[in-house]
């Protein structure tokens, strides 16, 4: 009875930074089941790319971060998420590309592109494009795909990013061929003093993974 009372009394806020990833669904499900057990714990979610999340982790503003690879986790403790993100391109329905089932580097060579502003991600993309990378037409860079989707809708170009299973009536997502996938890690600073709520959530996410 005392143990059950302690569980219910656990309280506090857990601040998590997260990029746009399918792993956010897994994390959201974990938050839901955690709050069923600890209803007095609240969560603060900060949406940003991995570089911005790491900056806030390092300054102590965030307790944890959901980071898409490639990312240096040397100074963090981490839990690798089971979900992987599939890369592709978001195009308007009236684009000639929308008629394809998948896109190749050659298909995108003459198309204005919107790409991630992260240098580490650009290096990954350059490996996929090979010698065509230097000939690409980069129209804009972005850090959140929803803003990029608005630019696609307005005709700025096609956006390279993850398949987040979002429904756009006037846009279509096409996977890359050859396929390209990216992993995600949930990280927190090594040797940091954890609040009881954060420590309990660390254990919970490991158990549900």
Residue locations for each model-derived region?
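Central regulatory/effector-binding core of bacterial HTH transcription factors
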Residues: 11-73, 133, 140-144
């Amino acid at each position: 009875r005392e143990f059950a009372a302690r569980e219910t009394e656990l309280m506090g806020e857990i601040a998590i930074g997260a990029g746009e990833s399918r792993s956010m669904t897994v994390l959201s499900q974990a938050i839901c089941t955690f709050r069923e057990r600890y209803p007095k714990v609240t969560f603060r979610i900060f949406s940003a790319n991995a570089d911005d999340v790491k900056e806030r982790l390092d300054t102590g503003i965030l307790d944890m971060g959901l980071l898409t690879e490639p990312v240096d986790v040397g100074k963090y403790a981490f839990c690798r998420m089971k979900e992987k993100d599939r890369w592709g391109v978001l195009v308007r329905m009236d684009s000639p590309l929308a008629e394809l089932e998948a896109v190749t580097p050659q298909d995108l060579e003459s198309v204005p592109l919107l790409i991630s502003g992260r240098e580490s991600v650009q290096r990954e993309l350059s490996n996929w494009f090979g010698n065509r990378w230097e000939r690409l037409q980069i129209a804009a860079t972005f850090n959140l795909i929803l803003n990029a989707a608005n630019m696609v809708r307005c005709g700025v170009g096609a956006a390279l990013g993850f398949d987040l299973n979002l429904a756009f009536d006037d846009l279509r997502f096409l996977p890359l061929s050859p396929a390209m996938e990216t992993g995600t890690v949930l990280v927190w600073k090594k040797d940091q003093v954890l609040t009881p709520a954060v420590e309990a959530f660390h254990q919970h996410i490991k158990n549900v993974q």
